[in-house]
Amino acid sequence: FGLAIHAHNLLLRHSDLNGLEISLKKIPLYEGAIKALNNNVKSSLNDANRNSIINYLKVDYNKINTKYLNCLFDPQTAGGFLFILDATQKRILDELDKKKINYSSIGRVTNSKKKIKVI
């Protein structure tokens, strides 16, 4: 599916969520993935995934590295590990830290009418 589709599915399943903002710079990528993105190498399903979600994305193409945008549509993601925490739930992050479980905060909840803003 890709990260963007997993994120959109979370929006659809939770009526109390209005929208999301994802920061491309905060998405952890392996060095090999960065090389592939910089060389415009993408998976065979990348375009189909992009086309299925593009109407739900708000992207300012002048402010992002458009090559890195493809990481949102690559089906080789662990979308099952994508979750949304209320800002008051710091104790969950503290527990992850305590157990030395790596995580990355890649965005936030917004009021963007079931859209995902990519920054």
Model regions and ranges:
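Glycine-/charge-enriched secondary-structure boundary and capping motifs
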Residues: 1-119
